[in-house]
Amino acid sequence: HSFVYEKLFSLWNTILYVCLIWTLTVVATVPNFFVGSLEYDPRIYSCTFVQTVSSSYTITVVVIHFILPITVVTFCYLRIWILVIQVRRKVKSEFKPRMKQSDFRNFLTMFVVFVIFAFCWAPLNFIGLAVSINPTEVAPKIPEWLFVVSYF
């Protein structure tokens, strides 16, 4: 694996990865300026994405930045879990060397990070979806404490 790692994370590739991340960040942020959805919110003492500016834009942001990635990663983890279960069953029946404990521990750690990510970002995104349904009616009904907690 060290040869693959050295090829994937060479100096040139690492510079490209950093540039790609910054480009994607700019591409994700620029539409906010055209929609006018960035405003100072005194509840969280920060400039943030205002979910009541445009329902269709809020839905698009939530789908592209939360629901789609969560769906793809969930699908991938389900496939990995199925593979792990199949390998464990096969190993037990054939008495072959089992899966490395460190590989399984690494997989489990990444899975926990994903679950924590989803758990932390879900409230804000679900509030955004709820607000986008009917901003004038739903937004005032969301308790301020819930909105503030969803940011932290």
Swiss-Prot record:
PROSITE patterns: G_PROTEIN_RECEP_F1_2. Residues 1-12, 79-110 are cytoplasmic. The chain crosses the membrane at residues 13-33, 58-78, 111-131, 145-152. It is a multi-pass membrane protein. One of its GO terms (biological process) is G protein-coupled receptor signaling pathway. InterPro entries: GPCR_Rhodpsn, GPCR_Rhodpsn_7TM, Melatonin_rcpt. Disulfide bonds: none annotated. The keyword Cell membrane applies. The keyword Transmembrane applies. One of its GO terms (cellular component) is plasma membrane. Residues 34-57, 132-144 are extracellular. GO terms for molecular function: G protein-coupled receptor activity; melatonin receptor activity. Keywords: Cell membrane, G-protein coupled receptor, Membrane, Receptor, Transducer, Transmembrane, Transmembrane helix. It is found in: Cell membrane. High affinity receptor for melatonin. The activity of this receptor is mediated by pertussis toxin sensitive G proteins that inhibits adenylate cyclase activity. Belongs to the G-protein coupled receptor 1 family. This is Melatonin receptor type 1B.
